[in-house]
Amino acid sequence: MAKKVAGQLKLQVKAGSANPSPPIGPALGQRGINIMEFCKAFNAATQEMEKGMPIPVVITYYQDKSFTFAMKQPPVSYWLKKEAKITSGSKTPGKGAKAGSLTKAQIKSIAEAKMKDLNAADIEGAMAMIEGSARAMGLEVVG
């Protein structure tokens, strides 16, 4: 017989640096999930990734206190900042100076990496979503 799902929890954890301190510890602890077991499993699963990369993770926990987790691709904003070589977006997007610029080729590479996590039918739709995110961060799309 299948385990009964008690709930799901969505967190964003930096790759290779899950630890029991807030916000991870309290979020897992109040649901009865073994915090250290999750931290060890997550860090092992992300050891090949760039340390510090934000990874969205969906944790499904069961009534017997066991859990499974699924990792997704880093957020679009992370990829945009990395490609544009900036630390943060514009404080006033759409007005004044641009925070940086990206080419259509860079947007396409991000879209291909994020395609399975996006709600887009094709690569052009995914590129349009990512261009919108770039404009919202004050980035200019050229080419």
UniProtKB/Swiss-Prot annotation:
<comment type="subunit">
    <text>Part of the ribosomal stalk of the 50S ribosomal subunit. Interacts with L10 and the large rRNA to form the base of the stalk. L10 forms an elongated spine to which L12 dimers bind in a sequential fashion forming a multimeric L10(L12)X complex.</text>
</comment>
<dbReference type="InterPro" id="IPR036796">
    <property type="entry name" value="Ribosomal_uL11_N_sf"/>
</dbReference>
<dbReference type="InterPro" id="IPR020783">
    <property type="entry name" value="Ribosomal_uL11_C"/>
</dbReference>
<dbReference type="GO" id="GO:0070180">
    <property type="term" value="F:large ribosomal subunit rRNA binding"/>
</dbReference>
<keyword id="KW-0689">Ribosomal protein</keyword>
<comment type="similarity">
    <text>Belongs to the universal ribosomal protein uL11 family.</text>
</comment>
<keyword id="KW-0488">Methylation</keyword>
<dbReference type="InterPro" id="IPR006519">
    <property type="entry name" value="Ribosomal_uL11_bac-typ"/>
</dbReference>
<dbReference type="Pfam" id="PF03946">
    <property type="entry name" value="Ribosomal_L11_N"/>
</dbReference>
<dbReference type="GO" id="GO:0006412">
    <property type="term" value="P:translation"/>
</dbReference>
<keyword id="KW-0687">Ribonucleoprotein</keyword>
<dbReference type="GO" id="GO:0022625">
    <property type="term" value="C:cytosolic large ribosomal subunit"/>
</dbReference>
<keyword id="KW-0694">RNA-binding</keyword>
<keyword id="KW-0699">rRNA-binding</keyword>
<dbReference type="InterPro" id="IPR000911">
    <property type="entry name" value="Ribosomal_uL11"/>
</dbReference>
<dbReference type="GO" id="GO:0003735">
    <property type="term" value="F:structural constituent of ribosome"/>
</dbReference>
<comment type="function">
    <text>Forms part of the ribosomal stalk which helps the ribosome interact with GTP-bound translation factors.</text>
</comment>
<protein>
    <recommendedName>
        <fullName>Large ribosomal subunit protein uL11</fullName>
    </recommendedName>
</protein>
<dbReference type="InterPro" id="IPR036769">
    <property type="entry name" value="Ribosomal_uL11_C_sf"/>
</dbReference>
<dbReference type="InterPro" id="IPR020784">
    <property type="entry name" value="Ribosomal_uL11_N"/>
</dbReference>
<dbReference type="Pfam" id="PF00298">
    <property type="entry name" value="Ribosomal_L11"/>
</dbReference>
